[in-house]
From Swiss-Prot:
Disulfide links within the chain: 168-191
Stretches assigned to the Cytoplasmic side: 1-6
Phylogenetic classification of the source organism: Eukaryota, Metazoa, Chordata, Craniata, Vertebrata
Classification via Pfam families: FKRP_N, LicD
Annotated protein name in UniProt: Ribitol 5-phosphate transferase FKRP
TM region positions: 7-29
Quaternary structure, from the entry: Homodimer; disulfide-linked. Forms a complex composed of FKRP, FKTN/fukutin, and RXYLT1/TMEM5. Also exists as large multimeric protein complexes. May interact with the dystrophin-glycoprotein complex (DGC).
Length: 494
């Protein structure tokens, strides 16, 4: 049957409407990032840079806007959003091959490679972009790459125009002393670390050769590792825009983010072995042991703590506890009229630099046995363990006939009190340990006692303490430091 012109026109109209309908439907199902709302510029550098977004809060963020802003500059821009676990609420990310979500916490149903961030980065460079930034001006990544290529620095940074833009800091990290110290940068814009919001660009191989490349807080973790390696960061005269709808806009969201940030930072620093941070301006922040926690090391074998084998000295929190305990014990002894003096390694530390030896793990004091009865705490310790009003624990040591004062019931950093008594002009005692310095000595070293700076206060010491120390340890002991048991581990590496 032949179709009339009317039927043909009707069929054509239906087909045209169907085509329009399917096209509009297809557009609506495309990711919003793939539909440019303005002119787009394809970057010649883009394929060599991966945008990596790690620092954001799952409960309140502007990550979709951030991703969208980079895709508007270059639809082919590789973007990786990294999180420990699947973010909740879910992130509204475009479902396109060059935008990927990396979950870093291992899971039973995923291969090991899926938890390694380098699996998701195939480019020469990586840009670490914080939440709250926005790619608004074309070519920023290209300029950062060129700046990195032309610099001796291993990282370059561009501030983000937020309320807290990045600024330069100097950073000194000492693993041996468990410390990190921040100061004003002497040669900005070249610095060791940054404080504030910035986009960081570095070579991918450098990032993924770090011990923990994406640990949070990211900036804290990253700069501790790069400063330790001597890698400088160059702060560029280049600014990224802030998000149009910035994250953490409410007071509650900011409070929650700050609380979780503090918790993450403390966990990070403890895991990296940093026990003390000195912030710019001199504020100290401690991340080690306290009266409420156990000390930072376990039982000592062979007079050589485990940390010495790791190339470290006594953690600063432990030294602080020893200083506090020593000052307190000396105050109690002096108030009770108990004659005491610095002994052993503690006297050696006082003679060298007026403090505890930096790898020592206790404090030793000698006391006159006949004065023990003058001190209420020592009398109580004769019968059993005594916890005084300051939380210090006074007790008889299980190793022999001497006293021990512990920092607390939880923290067993301690001061040992060795009771001596005179016999024919020689100071002796009833308990001897297998230490070279544990020997008798003439009483004239104690007549009189002399004041000596030690651990932040003035303590009593034997007169002619150099001869006293050389009697116990050997000639030249003050000038030639050595670990307590060089047969096991020597300071000189022999």
């Amino acid at each position: 049957m032949r179709l009339t012109r009317c039927w043909a026109a009707l069929a054509a109209a239906i087909i045209l409407n169907l085509l329009v309908f399917f096209y509009v439907s297809w557009l609506q199902h495309q990711p919003r990032n793939s539909r440019a709302r303005g002119p787009r510029r394809t970057s010649a550098i883009g394929p060599r840079v991966t945008v990596l977004i790690r620092e954001f809060e799952a409960f309140d963020n502007a990550v979709p806007e951030l991703v969208d802003s980079f895709l508007q500059q270059d639809p082919a821009q590789p973007v990786v959003v990294a999180a420990d676990t699947l973010p909740y609420p879910p992130l509204a990310l475009p479902r396109i091959p060059n935008v990927r979500l990396a979950l870093l916490q291992p899971a039973l149903d995923r291969p090991a490679a899926a938890s390694r961030p380098e699996t998701y980065v195939a480019t020469e460079f990586v840009a670490l972009v914080p939440d709250g930034a926005r790619a608004e001006s074309p070519g920023h990544l290209e300029r950062m790459v060129e700046a990195l290529r032309g610099s001796s620095a291993r990282l370059v940074a561009a501030p983000v125009a937020t309320a807290n833009p990045a600024r330069c800091l100097a950073l000194n990290v000492s693993l041996r002393e468990w410390t990190a110290r921040y100061d004003p940068a002497p040669s900005a814009p070249r610095c060791d670390a940054l404080d504030g919001d910035a986009v960081l660009l570095m070579r991918s191989r450098d990032l993924f050769n770090l011990s923990v490349p994406l640990a949070r807080p990211l900036a804290t973790s990253l700069f501790l590792q790069t400063a330790l390696r001597g890698w400088a960061v160059q702060l560029l005269d280049l600014t990224f825009a802030a998000a149009r709808q910035p994250p953490l806009a409410t007071a509650h969201a900011r409070w929650k983010a700050e609380r979780e940030g503090r918790s993450r930072r403390a966990a990070l620093l403890r895991s990296l072995g940093i026990r003390l941070v000195s912030w710019e301006g001199g504020r100290l922040e401690w991340f080690g042991c306290s009266k409420e926690s156990a000390r930072c090391f376990g039982t000592v074998a062979g007079d050589t703590p485990a940390y010495l084998y790791e190339g470290r000295w006594t953690p600063p929190c432990c030294l602080r506890a020893l200083r506090e305990t020593a000052r307190y014990v000396v105050g109690v002894l002096e108030a009770a009229g108990v004659r005491y003096w610095l002994e052993g390694g503690s006297l050696l530390g006082a003679a060298r630099h007026g403090d505890i030896i930096p790898w020592d793990y206790d404090v030793d004091l000698g006391i006159y046995l006949e004065d023990v009865g003058n001190c209420e705490q020592l009398r109580g310790a004769e019968a059993g363990s005594v916890v005084d009003e300051r939380g210090f624990v006074w007790e008889k040591a299980v190793e022999g006939d001497f006293f021990r004062v512990q920092y607390s019931e939880n923290n067993h950093l301690h001061v040992d009190l060795w009771p001596f008594y005179p016999r024919n002009g020689v100071m002796t005692k009833d308990t001897w340990l297998d230490h070279r310095q544990d020997v008798e000595f003439p009483e004239h070293f104690l007549q009189p006692l002399v004041p000596l700076p030690f651990a932040g206060f003035m303590a009593q010491a034997p007169n002619n303490y150099r001869r006293f120390l050389e009697l116990k340890f050997g000639p030249g002991v003050i000038e030639n430091p050595e670990y307590p048991n060089p047969a096991l581990l020597s300071l000189t590496g022999g």
